[in-house]
Amino acid sequence: MPWLQLKVIAPRRYVESIENALLAAGAASVTLQDNADQPIFEPGLGETPLWDNVKITGLFDAEIDTAKAIALAERRFGNPLPQHQWEQLEDKDWEREWMSNYHAIRCGERLWICPSWQEPPEPDKINLMLDPGLAFGTGTHPTTFLCMQWIDQQDFTDLEVIDYGCGSGILGIAALLLGARKVVGVDIDPQALLATTENAKRNQLPADAMPVYLPPHCPATQVDVMLANILAGPLAELAPTLSNMTKPGGKLCLSGILSVQAQSVMDAYAPWFDFDPVATHEEWVRLTAIKARA
């Protein structure tokens, strides 16, 4: 089905009003994008930050009367729309287009992340078959890649692992494929738990190899390796919890952390862990550590 896009450039103070105006004019959806190159880092609690200048894009049926749509939007907005233009959205098989742009990723000497619709480039390696879906974690993000590189270098034989904030389950599944006896997946998002379970099945892992839980239901246990690729704020808050769930002498691998946030996260875990040198990829870091023995 062909579509038209109405793109409006506006200061952030007008975003909500213009978004509502486009929906009132018949937009099927509205998306917001940065109109410059302004980064937004992790927000504080209760904050919903936006860029100073925002590109607001409304998606309309190609048969719409564009002049009428503009008139309806401006009536709802109460003023002429700021800088705007219509664009034809090419009619494509978007699923096939997306699939063609997602490729296998090598994560070290042993591990590959492979989309399930492609043949693994190196069939004799350990190939984690993944269908990226609604949950975070495909290997393309620097934080996931950093964690996967570290996992590739470890001996997981017969170890127990927690993947805290499991997303797609990619980190925990990699540990299982490298010999871990059991991995527990934990996430606040039920969709992530479903994605993890489906991806574990896709990799032909036993049904009981990776049980998944919402945090309140996670069993009280201690594991040999703690993996957590989330965000700096939650990681710092979770330091006592993740420490209690890690055995003395156990390993910790954290990411989802910007370089400028690394020290504050390390400080939160310092009472329990001794850190290795920081690993960096682009503006992101990976922190690894050993829990001090009692």
Swiss-Prot record:
S-adenosyl-L-methionine binds at residues 144, 165, 187, 229. It comes from the Bacteria. It is an enzyme of class 2 (transferase). CDD domains: AdoMet_MTases. Belongs to the methyltransferase superfamily. PrmA family. Its EC number is 2.1.1.-. Methylates ribosomal protein L11. GO terms for cellular component: cytosol. Keywords: Cytoplasm, Methyltransferase, S-adenosyl-L-methionine, Transferase. Gene3D superfamilies: Vaccinia Virus protein VP39. It catalyses: L-lysyl-[protein] + 3 S-adenosyl-L-methionine = N(6),N(6),N(6)-trimethyl-L-lysyl-[protein] + 3 S-adenosyl-L-homocysteine + 3 H(+). GO terms for biological process: methylation. It is found in: Cytoplasm. GO terms for molecular function: protein-lysine N-methyltransferase activity. Its main location: cytoplasm. This is Ribosomal protein L11 methyltransferase.
